[in-house]
Each structure stands twice: as C-alpha cells, then as structure tokens.
Amino acid sequence: MPQLNPSPWLLILLFSWLIFLTMLPSKTQLHTFPNMPSTQNMCKQEPEPWTWPWA
C-alpha cells in the first residue's frame, strides 16, 4: 500500500510548510488598509431623538 510509505508524503508536507512559512508572512505584513483608523472625537454628543414614521 503506497499510502503507508511516509517518504514522499513527509517531504511534500515539509516543503509545503516551508513555503507557507517563508512566503505568507511577508505577503501578510505588506498588506495595507485602505482607510487608516482615526482617533475618536472626545466630546460627548447628545443623541438626537428619532421620530417613528408610523407614530
């Protein structure tokens, strides 16, 4: 049964993890967000009352 022979599968597994661990961190660290987060306004705003259209 060739499935039980770990020789080719172990090498494939190791090479795939090697590729994932070398390429993916560099690609994810280069990701930029389209909108940079801004600081929240510190002054307290009063909520405006909302009128229900059916009332």
UniProtKB/Swiss-Prot annotation:
The lineage of its organism: Eukaryota, Metazoa, Chordata, Craniata, Vertebrata. It comes from the Eukaryota. Keywords: ATP synthesis, CF(0), Hydrogen ion transport, Ion transport, Membrane, Mitochondrion, Transmembrane, Transmembrane helix, Transport. The chain crosses the membrane at residues 4-24. It is a single-pass membrane protein. Belongs to the ATPase protein 8 family. One of its GO terms (molecular function) is proton transmembrane transporter activity. Subunit 8, of the mitochondrial membrane ATP synthase complex (F(1)F(0) ATP synthase or Complex V) that produces ATP from ADP in the presence of a proton gradient across the membrane which is generated by electron transport complexes of the respiratory chain. ATP synthase complex consist of a soluble F(1) head domain - the catalytic core - and a membrane F(1) domain - the membrane proton channel. These two domains are linked by a central stalk rotating inside the F(1) region and a stationary peripheral stalk. GO terms for biological process: proton motive force-driven ATP synthesis. The gene is MT-ATP8. One of its GO terms (cellular component) is mitochondrial membrane. Residues 36-55 are annotated as: Disordered. Component of the ATP synthase complex composed at least of ATP5F1A/subunit alpha, ATP5F1B/subunit beta, ATP5MC1/subunit c (homooctomer), MT-ATP6/subunit a, MT-ATP8/subunit 8, ATP5ME/subunit e, ATP5MF/subunit f, ATP5MG/subunit g, ATP5MK/subunit k, ATP5MJ/subunit j, ATP5F1C/subunit gamma, ATP5F1D/subunit delta, ATP5F1E/subunit epsilon, ATP5PF/subunit F6, ATP5PB/subunit b, ATP5PD/subunit d, ATP5PO/subunit OSCP. It holds the Pfam family ATP-synt_8. It is found in: Mitochondrion membrane. This is ATP synthase F(0) complex subunit 8.
